[in-house]
């Protein structure tokens, strides 16, 4: 009897441990992806960062406003800061200079979707623009 009881307890334990290993694929919001694809004028592939594309599409048409970081108006560093918070749950500083300090350098050939790209003006060599 004790032998059977220990088998039953082991079987129940195994069942619970295996059931906790179950994972499911993330749900895709096909409507939001289709809308983002149309708004951005691009094809969004299965392996693309869907959350980034959907969030980015929401900002199309927002006017430029120096120092802005909301849908009433934004500049490039404000947009990057908001998208990183929304998509990656990462809080970046508000200024391009600070965002550069918080970043790790990556070679051009190793750039991946979601990496930050910084631009300088040719004349002054000062940081002037940031993009994802």
List each language-model region with its residue ranges.
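Sec-dependent bacterial lipoprotein signal peptides
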Residues: 1-19
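Bacterial Sec signal peptide processing site at the extreme N-terminus
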Residues: 15-38
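Post-signal-peptide N-terminal segment of Sec-exported extracytoplasmic proteins
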Residues: 28, 36-73
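Catalytic cysteine-centered active-site loop
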Residues: 39-40, 63-113
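Conserved PDZ fold ligand-binding element
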Residues: 116
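A flexible loop/linker signature enriched in serine peptidases of the S9 family
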Residues: 122-125
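Conserved small/polar residues in nucleotide/adenosyl-binding loops
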Residues: 130-132
């Amino acid at each position: 009897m004790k032998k059977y009881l220990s088998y039953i307890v082991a079987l129940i334990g195994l069942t619970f441990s295996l059931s906790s290993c179950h994972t499911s694929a993330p749900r895709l919001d096909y409507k939001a992806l289709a809308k983002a694809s149309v708004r951005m004028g691009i094809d969004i592939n299965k392996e693309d960062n869907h959350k980034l594309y959907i969030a980015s599409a929401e900002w199309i048409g927002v006017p430029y406003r120096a120092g802005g970081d909301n849908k009433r108006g934004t500049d490039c560093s404000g947009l990057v800061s908001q998208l990183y918070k929304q998509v990656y749950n990462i809080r970046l500083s508000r200024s391009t200079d600070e965002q550069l300090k918080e970043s790790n350098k990556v070679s051009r050939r190793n750039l991946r979707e979601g990496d930050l790209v910084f631009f300088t003006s040719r004349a002054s060599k000062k940081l002037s623009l940031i993009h994802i």
